[in-house]
Curated annotation (Swiss-Prot):
Family as reported in the entry's similarity comment: Belongs to the V-ATPase D subunit family.
Record's function text: Produces ATP from ADP in the presence of a proton gradient across the membrane.
Alphabetical list of HAMAP family matching this protein: ATP_synth_D_arch (MF_00271)
Protein name in the entry: V-type ATP synthase subunit D
One matching Pfam family: ATP-synt_D
Amino acid sequence: MSRAATTRMGLLEVRARRAVAGKGARLLRAKREVLASELWRLVHDVLEGRARLDEALRRAVKALELAKALEGEERLASLALPAARAVPLAVTVRRVWGVPTPSVAAPPLVRAADQRGSSPVSWGPSGAAAARHHEESLEVLLTIASKELHLARLGEEIQETSRRINALEQLVLPALRSEASRIAAALDERDREDAVRLRRFRARHPRPA
């Protein structure tokens, strides 16, 4: 940081900069508190979502194993091929205290038997159940993915905000306080010297009676 002029205007300038830096640090702390609150809310949602995903995948795997046993892998593979599809995803960005956070949305993924590319009668009950459970798992997965993207972005922004707070509080503000003290001390010393010179001048040049 460059030194300010050792003048009263320089002192006022440094004090004004210190006030702005202090206000900036307070605003950043408020921002971090809001982001942290949002982060902890999301952590709870993500943990809950992962538990739902674990349960959905457990059901899907169990249903698939049963379908393989009852209908055979070859038949299931022949049904899976026409059932394949592209899933359109919509990614939007919202802002929390100016932080862009992505959100992923998809249409409903669980389909009726007649929407899987084959005649409904082609699907046995166990194969249809396995397909449904896997589609349900994908829905849960996409919901969690959106929240985890948001969680990661918030974590990055909290770290960046903390770095900025530390820079202000540990570097900028102490430097400005030190600079203000230096200028104030120099001005005080200058005032004392001026007072001494004035007294000497008056002593040498007394006013006429």
